Amino acid sequence: MNWYEKKNSFNLKDKVVNRAVNSLRKNKRIEQISFAAIAEELDVSIDDITSFYATTEDIFLQAQKKDWESLHRYWDKQIKKAKTPGDFKNAFEIFFERFVETLSKDADLHFELSCYLPECVKFRDKNRIKVKEKFTKLIKRGWPGKNEIVIQRQSELVTVLFYGFVDHIVHIPKNERSKILSDFRNMLNLHLQDRKFF
């Protein structure tokens, strides 16, 4: 597949996701999403869509994976560059900034589906472990002097807080998210300054 074909396939995939989201917002039921209707709206064949997606659930699963893979790539670059405790703290904070910056206008719906559709829930649970592992590494390197028990307890709590934060922030207007993000980051930093525990 050449560059032009790849670009077209990415564009089509994005359009399919957008049409599926629009259909879901309108009909409120995932069962109402139709490959035939989406194909007709986009003026493509059903085969074009099924070459990317096996089921309607697969549309949302792949969108979820795409978003998180992009976020992890960005985060991993920041972690790889880190050398000092300050660098690791920065990589910790940058993750939250990037997460909020890249939330789509349909983030609320994607979040709800990640907690509802079986394959999306499986991916979410697997990804949660990956996120926690990175929090653990960053807490250990960014706030040195803590013992392993404290690091594990803090990384577990930060993970729980982060997923609660996600549930909240996807449901508020985009122009209000930066204030919530700032408060959330300040709260985490205050907690993580304690070497014994919160």
Positions of PLM-derived features:
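Hydrophobic alpha-helical connector segments
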Residues: 62, 76-105
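Basic, helix-initiating cap at the start of DNA-binding domains
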Residues: 1-29, 37
